[in-house]
Curated annotation (Swiss-Prot):
Gene that specifies this protein: awd
Lineage: Eukaryota, Metazoa, Ecdysozoa, Arthropoda, Hexapoda
Provenance organism: Drosophila melanogaster
Main location class: cytoplasm
Result after altering residue 15 to N: In KRm5; lethal due to loss of phosphorylated active site intermediate
Known partners and oligomeric status: Homohexamer.
Note, other: Mutations cause abnormal tissue morphology and necrosis and widespread aberrant differentiation.
The reaction(s) this protein catalyses: a 2'-deoxyribonucleoside 5'-diphosphate + ATP = a 2'-deoxyribonucleoside 5'-triphosphate + ADP; a ribonucleoside 5'-diphosphate + ATP = a ribonucleoside 5'-triphosphate + ADP
Pfam families per UniProt: NDK (PF00334)
Protein name: Nucleoside diphosphate kinase
Positions of post-translational N-acetylalanine modification: 2
Enzyme class: transferase
GO MF terms, alphabetically ordered: ATP binding; GTP binding; kinase activity; magnesium ion binding; microtubule binding; nucleoside diphosphate kinase activity
Keyword set, alphabetical order: Acetylation, ATP-binding, Cytoplasm, Cytoskeleton, Kinase, Magnesium, Metal-binding, Microtubule, Nucleotide metabolism, Nucleotide-binding, Phosphoprotein, Transferase
Phosphoserine modifications at: 126
Effect of residue 122 to N: In KRm12; lethal due to lower enzyme activity
Length: 153
């Protein structure tokens, strides 16, 4: 996959949806120059969430995390672009909002780690796994934005 075709999985969590932050989050990724290739508005089942967070299943906070993520609708998305996984994580800010810098999504919009409004893949491999878990191949839209020549050399 070409470097500017890298994909990441980003999901607005229930608190981000309830607070009306979906548009602001999408706007930040669009303004950066990343391309949206998939988006859903859904209420995730506990089974799906348990698969998504399987690597955390032994942690004491796991049941609470699954319940929180199942407490309202979420907005899973797939974004594409050059170094989108790394840059996306930087845009999100630290997992704990108290450690997030102003200008990051978490630094600007949240206070506590238990309500940190957004998830982002931490590596290309986890992005591929998460994208396959939440979207089927037909839901990933291939298109060319008119602005691409103004973003990439």
């Amino acid at each position: 996959m070409a470097a500017n075709k890298e994909r990441t999985f980003i999901m607005v969590k229930p608190d981000g949806v309830q607070r009306g932050l979906v548009g602001k989050i999408i706007e930040r990724f669009e303004q950066k120059g990343f391309k949206l290739v998939a988006l859903k508005f859904t209420w995730a089942s506990k089974e799906l969430l348990e698969k998504h967070y399987a690597d955390l299943s032994a942690r004491p906070f796991f049941p609470g995390l699954v319940n929180y993520m199942n407490s309202g609708p979420v907005v899973p998305m797939v974004w594409e672009g050059l170094n989108v996984v790394k840059t996306g994580r930087q845009m999100l800010g630290a997992t704990n909002p108290a450690d997030s810098l102003p200008g990051t999504i978490r630094g600007d919009f949240c206070i506590q780690v238990g309500r940190n409004i957004i998830h982002g893949s931490d590596a290309v491999e986890s992005a591929e796994k998460e994208i396959a878990l939440w979207f089927n191949e037909k839901e990933l839209v291939t298109w060319t934005p008119a602005a691409k020549d103004w973003i990439y050399e």
